[in-house]
Amino acid sequence: FRNLPIAQLTQSEFSAFLTKLGVGAEKSISIRQAIKNSPSKISNLITTPLMLTLVVIVYEAESQIPETLPEFFDRLFQTVFSRHDRIKAAFTRKHYSGLSEKSLQRLFEAFCFMSLQSGHGRTISQSQFDEIFDHACEYADQSNCDSMKFKQDIVQVACLMLEDGVDSYTFLHKSIVEYYAAAFVLSLGDNNAKMFYSSTIEKSSGWEETLRFLRSIDSFRYFRDYVIPIVNAERTEVLASIVDNSNESIISTFKRLYPGLGVYFRMDTETKGAVKVSAYGSIIERSADHLTGLGFLLMDALAEMTINVNTIEELNSQFNAHPEHAIDDLGVHVPAEALLRAYGAAEVRKAFDSYKNKLDKLADEANEIVGKENKKSLIFSRRQSKSEIG
C-alpha cells in the first residue's frame, strides 16, 4: 500500500459537496456566505470534505460561524459530541472511552500538548500515539481509559484525527493540535503556566501557532509571562548595545545576533556579466523573532543595501568575490559586516529603529492588558473597606 496525495478542497467546490451532504439550497447559501464573511478566516481551514462537514455541524449548532478561531475550536469539540446528538435526535454517539465529554476534552488537550512537546508533526505512528497517550493520562484528571478506546472516540466519533495508512494517525488540521495544546496551557495553574512560557522564551520553535492562540485565550499570562520578559530582555540585549548609534556598535551587534547572515550572489544566466541575489544566509533562531521579526527586518535592510550590486565587476572590485568561486548552488557569500563597511549602516539603523518601535508597541499593549487585570484586585479591597465602614 502507499499513500497518494489528494487535491485540497476549494471554495468553488463547497456548493456541490454541501448538496451531497443533503444541505438544502437556501441553507447552503447561508453556510457559504457565513464562511466567506467569517472574521476568523475559517475558509483557510477548510481543505478537506471532512473539515467542511465539521464546519457545517458547528454552524447548525450555533446558527453562525464563531468569530474567532479559538471560539470555533472550542465549539467544535462540544458540537461533535453532545450538540450534534441533540440535533440528530435519532442518532446517539457512543463514547468508547467511557469518559464524560469534559474529561475526554481535557485528555485530548493534554494529548495535543504532549504531541507538540515530543516534537511530533501532524502525523504520528501507532507507537507514538500510545506513548503520547500515556504521558497525557499523567496530566489529565479523571482519564481512566485505555489508548484504543480513546483513539476510537477521537478518530471514529469526533473525527479530529484520521487513520493514515496502516500504522499512523493524522490530525485533521494542524490548527487542531495547536489550539487544543493552547487550551491545555490555559487549564494550568499559574506556576506551571509560567514554566511553560519561560521555556518558550528560550525556544519557541514548534510553539509559534500555539502561542498565537494563547494570545487570545490566555492573554493576561501570555503578556505577563511571555511578552514582557522578552521585551525587557531584547531592550537590554539589543537596543542597549546600539545606544550610541555608531556604525561599529551596529556592526558588532549585527554579527553577535546573526553571525551567519549575509548575501549570496550568483551569476544571472539571462544577462551576461550580471549577478543577482540568491539568498541571505542562515538565521540562528531567536524567540524574539516570533514577536518582532528582527531577522527579517535585517534581511530587508541587506536587500536595500545591495539593490545596486548588479555586475560581476562591481561584486569583484568591492568584495573580491566572484560567483565562479562559489562552493554550492547558492553562489558566493558576502558577509553582512563587509556589506556594512562598504555601504554604511544607514539601512540597518532604520531596521533597528523599526524594531524598537515594535518593542515599544508590544510593551504598551502588554502593560495595558496586565494593568487592567491587576486593577481587578481593587474590587476586593473596596469590598473590605465597605465592610469595615459598616
Give the predicted meaning of each segment.
Residues F1, Q8-Y169, K174-I176, F184-S187, ...:
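Extended hydrophobic
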Residues P5, I29-K36, H135-F171, S175-G390:
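Leucine-enriched alpha-helical scaffold segments used for protein-protein interaction
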